[in-house]
Amino acid sequence: MPKHSKRYNEIRKLVDSEKAYTLDEAVELLKKTATAKFDETVEFHIKTNIDYRKSEQNIRSTISLPHGTGKSVRVLVFAKGEKAEEAKQAGADYVGAEELADKIANEGFVDFDVAIATPDMMKVIGKLGKVLGPRGLMPNPKTGTVTEDIAAAVSEFKKGKVEVRTDKTGNLHFPVGKASFEPDKLKENIKSAYEQILSLRPAGVKGHFIKKAVVATTMGPGIKLDLNVLAEGKR
């Protein structure tokens, strides 16, 4: 077992691993356990009841947080002509076509958080799957990153739109803010994220969709949420 620091062991005592906390209690604990020297990210970990062996049950989508993630999001756009100009006007950090694809393919350039493309660019970026795919950066219609409405997509991701996808065991992990956020903003982000995840329930899931939900700061212990009260008991 990994050896934890003295700091971690001290804050670990604040959290009862057997207890399921209300959202108010959980956010209060998030504040108390965020003791690192940097502004820790608040992470949401959700254990689902999907059968991850069935591809139709795996989730890949996006959610929008009311108050964003608190992180500066670097957006790259594959587009030409008028669409490229729209991307620049909307605040995209990198805009280009073949030359940008070549930079990624030949130089391994991946200094960005989101990649968006117009549909006509898919033939250009098809070769980038091996580089972008494993990093979760490959544009995909399911996540709104292959679109004609480039300006709206750039704006949404800049404001805090978050991609969510189940991992190899059917669980979800994504940011919902920073430890420095005001308590009410953290609560609103967490509650909104949970409700949006509920709406993504695959048709074939039997019983409860959500088995467990935990929030934690980057360097802090997991805090289990009481699902009986989080969204009026919806799971």
UniProtKB/Swiss-Prot annotation:
Signal peptide positions (record): none
GO cellular-component term (any): large ribosomal subunit
Annotated CDD domains: Ribosomal_L1
Origin: domain of life: Bacteria
Annotated coiled-coil segments of the chain: none
Keywords: Repressor, Ribonucleoprotein, Ribosomal protein, RNA-binding, rRNA-binding, Translation regulation, tRNA-binding
Keyword Ribonucleoprotein: yes
tRNA-binding keyword on record: yes
Gene Ontology molecular function: rRNA binding; structural constituent of ribosome; tRNA binding
Gene3D superfamilies noted in UniProt: 3.30.190.20, 3.40.50.790
Biological processes, Gene Ontology terms: regulation of translation; translation
UniProt-listed SUPFAM superfamilies: Ribosomal protein L1
PANTHER family in the cross-refs: 54S RIBOSOMAL PROTEIN L1, MITOCHONDRIAL (PTHR36427), LARGE RIBOSOMAL SUBUNIT PROTEIN UL1M (PTHR36427:SF3)
HAMAP family: Ribosomal_uL1_B (MF_01318_B)
Subunit structure comment from the entry: Part of the 50S ribosomal subunit.
Function: Binds directly to 23S rRNA. The L1 stalk is quite mobile in the ribosome, and is involved in E site tRNA release. Protein L1 is also a translational repressor protein, it controls the translation of the L11 operon by binding to its mRNA.
Protein family: Belongs to the universal ribosomal protein uL1 family.
Name this polypeptide is given: Large ribosomal subunit protein uL1
Organism: Fervidobacterium nodosum (strain ATCC 35602 / DSM 5306 / Rt17-B1)
Lineage: Bacteria, Thermotogati, Thermotogota, Thermotogae, Thermotogales
